[in-house]
C-alpha cells in the first residue's frame, strides 16, 4: 500500500452526464470505472457526494455511502461504480440541470472528484398500473407525457403540435374515436420509447426498435383520423388502423408523418380508406406497409426497408424475408383492396419489395405511376411510367441506407445527388403537393419520387 502523495486514481470519465430524466421516475444505471494505473495499491479512505439529493451510488455492491470507507485497489486493478438519478418533481415545466460531485479521498491525502449531471423534466403520467380508459383526451405541448401501460381513449383524441409522448416498455395507445393530431414541420408530434439514455456510447436507445408496443386506431364505426407531422418511432407496431366496418369505411389522412424502426409492422391498413402523402415509412422487421380492404392512395411517400442494415447488433429481432409493401386483395369477405402508389419510392436491401396478392393481375384496380420501385414481379398493365431497380445499378438511392455507428451516421432517406429517383415523378400528381416533407418547394420543378425533393 503506497502513501506516495503523487499517486492518484484514473476514471473512465471526468464528467458523468445523464440524458433527460423524468421526475419521480428514475434513470437507468450508468457505470463509472475507477482505475489504479500505478504499480502499488492505493487505499480510498472515503467516498461521498457533495449534495447527495438526486444521485444514488453503488460501489462494488455497496449502496450505503457511510460504509464506503477503507477501500483498496491493487496496482493495475479497477473497481465498478454504478450511479442512478432520482429527481423530485420540479417547480416549473422546463428542464432543470441537476448536478453533484462524487469525491474520492485517498489515504495519501489526495482528493479527486467526478462531476455528475442530469436534466430533470416534469412529466404527465398515464395508466400507472394496468389499463386506463378515458372518454376523451388532449395531448398538449406543455409537458411531456409518459404512458406506462395501456391507455385507451374511447372518444375524441387530440394531439397538439409539439406534443411529446413517451411510451414505457410494452405500453400502447388505443384510440376508438376520431383522432385529430396536427403537428407541424417546426413542431412535430413525437411518439417514442421512454429510454432517453444510450445502449452504447455511440448508440441511443432510440435506435433500437421494440421498446414499446404500438398505436392502434380501431373502431366498429366509420371514424375520421387526421395525422399531420406525427413521428412514430421504434416500437413493435408503428400505426395499426383497422375496423370491422364494411361500408362506409373509416377515413385516414396522413401528411408529413414518419413511421420508423419497428420490430413488426410500420403501417397496417385494414378495412379503412387512406390518403398518405409526404410521409416516410422505413425500417420495419416485417412489412413497412400492409394493406387489406379499402382504397389507399400513397402520394410522394418513401417506403425504405433497411431494418438492421448495419454492422452492429442493436435490434432484438432480425429482418424477416418480407417485402416492404404487401397488398392483400385475396379476401372473399373483406372490402376490395384498391391500393395505389404515385410519385413514391419503394425499395430496400432485398430483391423484391412490392407484392400485390390478387387473383387476377389485370383486374386489380390500383395503379402505380411515377415511382421508383425495387421489384421483380410488378409488371402489371396499371403500372406505368415507373423506374425499376436493376441489378446493374451502381448509384445510391438515398444519402445513407446503412447505419455507420462508429461514425455516428444514421439512416437518411433523403435523395443522393445521383439518385435514380430524381426527376421521375408525375407533374400532375405533384401539383396539390407543392412542398416536400422538409418544406422545400417542388413548384416549377420536375418532381422527384418520394417525400423528399432533392436539394442540390
Q: Where are the language model's segments positioned?
A:
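Beta-strand/loop edge motif enriched in small/polar residues
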Residues: 8-20, 25-27, 65-411, 418-433, ...
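A short beta-strand segment in extracellular, disulfide-stabilized domains
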Residues: 29-31
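Asparagine-centered strand-capping/turn motif at beta-strand->loop junctions
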Residues: 34-38
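Short beta-strand/loop motifs in extracellular/secreted proteins, especially
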Residues: 40-45, 53
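Short, solvent-exposed loop/linker segments at beta-strand-coil boundaries, enriched for Pro/Gly
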Residues: 48-67
Amino acid at each position: 500500500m503506497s502513501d506516495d502523495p503523487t499517486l492518484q486514481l484514473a476514471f473512465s470519465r471526468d464528467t458523468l452526464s445523464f440524458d433527460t430524466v423524468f421526475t419521480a421516475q428514475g434513470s437507468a444505471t450508468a457505470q463509472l470505472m475507477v482505475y489504479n494505473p500505478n504499480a502499488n495499491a492505493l487505499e480510498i479512505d472515503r467516498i461521498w457526494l457533495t449534495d447527495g439529493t438526486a444521485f444514488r451510488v453503488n460501489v462494488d455492491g455497496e449502496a450505503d455511502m457511510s460504509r464506503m470507507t477503507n477501500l483498496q485497489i491493487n496496482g493495475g486493478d479497477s473497481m465498478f461504480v454504478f450511479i442512478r438519478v432520482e429527481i423530485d418533481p420540479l417547480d416549473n415545466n422546463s428542464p432543470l440541470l441537476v448536478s453533484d460531485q462524487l469525491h474520492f479521498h485517498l489515504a495519501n491525502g489526495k482528493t479527486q472528484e467526478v462531476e455528475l449531471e442530469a436534466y430533470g423534466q416534469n412529466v404527465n403520467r398515464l395508466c400507472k398500473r394496468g389499463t386506463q380508459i378515458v372518454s376523451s383526451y388532449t395531448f398538449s405541448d406543455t409537458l411531456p407525457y409518459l404512458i406506462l401501460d395501456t391507455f385507451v381513449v374511447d372518444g375524441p383524441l387530440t394531439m397538439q403540435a409539439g406534443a411529446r409522448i413517451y411510451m414505457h416498455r410494452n405500453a400502447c395507445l388505443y384510440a376508438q374515436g376520431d383522432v385529430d393530431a396536427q403537428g407541424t414541420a417546426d413542431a412535430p408530434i413525437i411518439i417514442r420509447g421512454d429510454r432517453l439514455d444510450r445502449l452504447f456510447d455511440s448508440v441511443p436507445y432510440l435506435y433500437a426498435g421494440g421498446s414499446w408496443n404500438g398505436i392502434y386506431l380501431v373502431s366498429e364505426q366509420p371514424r375520421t383520423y387526421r395525422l399531420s407531422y406525427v413521428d412514430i418511432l421504434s416500437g413493435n407496431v408503428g400505426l395499426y388502423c383497422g375496423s370491422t366496418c364494411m361500408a362506409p369505411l373509416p377515413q385516414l389522412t396522413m401528411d408529413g408523418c414518419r413511421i420508423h424502426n419497428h420490430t413488426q409492422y410500420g403501417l397496417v391498413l385494414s378495412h379503412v380508406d387512406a390518403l398518405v402523402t409526404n410521409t416516410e415509412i422505413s425500417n420495419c422487421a416485417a412489412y413497412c406497409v400492409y394493406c387489406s380492404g379499402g382504397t389507399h392512395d400513397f402520394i410522394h411517400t418513401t417506403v425504405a426497408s433497411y431494418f438492421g442494415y448495419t454492422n452492429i447488433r442493436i435490434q432484438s429481432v432480425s429482418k424477416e424475408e418480407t417485402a416492404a409493401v404487401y397488398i392483400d386483395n385475396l379476401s372473399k369477405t373483406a372490402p376490395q383492396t384498391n391500393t395505389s402508389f404515385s410519385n413514391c419510392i419503394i425499395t430496400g436491401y432485398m430483391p423484391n419489395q412490392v407484392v400485390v396478392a390478387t387473383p387476377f393481375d389485370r383486374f386489380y384496380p390500383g395503379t402505380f405511376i411515377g415511382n421508383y420501385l425495387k421489384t421483380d414481379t410488378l409488371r402489371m398493365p396499371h403500372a406505368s411510367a415507373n423506374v425499376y431497380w436493376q441489378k446493374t445499378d451502381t448509384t445510391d438511392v438515398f444519402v445513407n441506407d446503412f447505419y455507420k455507428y462508429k461514425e455516428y451516421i444514421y439512416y437518411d432517406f433523403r435523395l443522393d445527388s445521383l439518385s435514380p429517383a430524381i426527376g421521375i415523378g408525375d407533374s400532375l400528381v405533384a401539383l396539390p403537393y407543392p412542398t416536400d416533407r422538409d418544406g422545400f418547394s417542388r413548384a416549377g420543378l420536375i418532381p422527384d419520387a418520394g417525400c423528399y425533393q432533392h436539394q442540390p
